Amino acid sequence: GAFVASDKEAGAEQTVQWFRANEMELLDCVQVRNALEPLAARLMAERSQPEDLLELQHIHQKFVEAVEKQDAATIAKYDEKFHTSIVKASRNQLLIKINHQTCERIKNFRQRTFQHNQNALNAIMPHAKILAALQAGDADAAEHYMHSHLELVAQDLISMTRDGNVSL
């Protein structure tokens, strides 16, 4: 028991140190995402095809399954797919290019964030609300729920960097 606990504590401390070392770049990325992804959600609600919604529903289900298994790498993969599929369905080529650059910069952030299973659990309901708004074609709600979701991501980041609030 004590050996496992000390390994977990060491892993948590390494995660906190990584977040602190990268805090400014991560906050920059979160701010850019919070400017662009609510717009992408609005545009998807207005422009999406039925196959876009089916794909997003499938991705969300895979995300939930990965959270239930506490598989951080798969959670990160499907979180990225969830957000990227929304951006792609916006049909806005500049948003798609910027999203690609942002995804590359936050890949490590996603993987480290989802090692803390509470962060993954915290994403299920916001993703479900975004999906439901998109399925209803409600652009205002899709934009609102995406903005709220990314505000929580920012709060999780601040919690991890400022308070060292991480438990693996």
Predicted regions and their residues:
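Short acidic-aromatic low-complexity motifs
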Residues: 134-137
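Short coil/turn segments at secondary-structure junctions
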Residues: 17-24, 66, 70, 114
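Short linear motifs at protein or domain termini
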Residues: 1-42, 159-168
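Active-site loop of classical SDR/Rossmann-like NAD(P)-dependent oxidoreductases
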Residues: 119-121
